[in-house]
Amino acid sequence: MYSVNAPVPAAVNELAAELRPALTEFDRVRERHEQTLLVKRVPASDRKELRTAWQTAQDALSGAPAVEARVSEVDTFENPPNGSSPVVYLAVESPGIHRLHERLCSVFDPVPVMEGGDDYDPHVTLARDASGFQGQRAVDAIHGRQVGPVTWTIDELYLYDAEYGERVDTLSLPA
């Protein structure tokens, strides 16, 4: 899977590290290098298709400004549309990220139930997979917790290859 992502600052990684003790009941806890902000998935089945898709994304983002983002709360997806549940995340408030997402949805079809319109919830995943009584207790203990706040400027986006866990290319904002 490929995606356009926004980097998160060290202060967001520090929030995640502070929350880590509350995430011990989860089967999968994201490491610092895995904490990112997904802006839009990119349809491509290989690197050749990806080059074309990335050019399309860059064209759609042409003239896009740097945007502000803010994290101040922990939230959960109890039943995410794909993958295991529950998912615990830092909720990202950013009208600008929504506008960037909309630009990309104008050239790439939104993933049903996950992207486009009200379905897109910008977030930084912290952990997923917690079952049984202990899992529910872990979710209840962290859901809605106030954190930070951390505010930052997103002045670049990057193309991410999830298979290899690496950045493929970067786009500076304003684009």
Where are these regions (language model features)?
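Compositionally biased, intrinsically disordered low-complexity regions enriched in proline and serine
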Residues: 3, 90, 106, 159-161
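Helix-adjacent hinge/juxtasegments
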Residues: 63-102
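Short proline/glycine- and acidic-rich turn/helix-capping motifs at secondary-structure junctions
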Residues: 72-80, 120-122, 155-166
